[in-house]
């Protein structure tokens, strides 16, 4: 059994709503399900990627996880800001932010005349929470977010029990 799983380094940040769609997060979640301490790491860049800072961050976080462990069913989501002059601002423990996608579907036709739909869209950043993952990387900080596998909305359970199923 491995001592640690590091998923990534992913090209592009995994913040806000994107956590739900991320293969990088999913791979770390699988490790967590197997009882292996796991880290998902992403670089906030899609072009001109320089992974040198991300490699240093990954080694530091990995060492800390090996030395300190993680709670059961918990993984770390680490996002590294794109290379900025002067280096990173530091590390910030964050929570999942409110960045989401506004999806659009474009009707297209392939070379054989078959219709298909292409999903496109844009990122909507409504996040102003200074402790969120997206705000941290915009300010040059490495975002470290503890994620848990348990996604039940416990606050809603009692109300849901009153529904007439």
Identify the function of each model-found stretch.
Residues 27-32:
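Hydrophobic/aromatic ligand-binding patch that stacks against planar heteroaromatic rings
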Residues 39-68:
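Short, glycine-/small-residue-rich phosphate/pyrophosphate-handling segment
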Residues 13-22:
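Glycine/threonine-rich flexible loop motifs
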Residues 10-13, 149:
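Short glycine-rich anion-binding loops that position phosphate/pyrophosphate groups of nucleotides
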Residues 67, 71, 81-165:
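C-terminal accessory domains and tails appended to enzymatic cores
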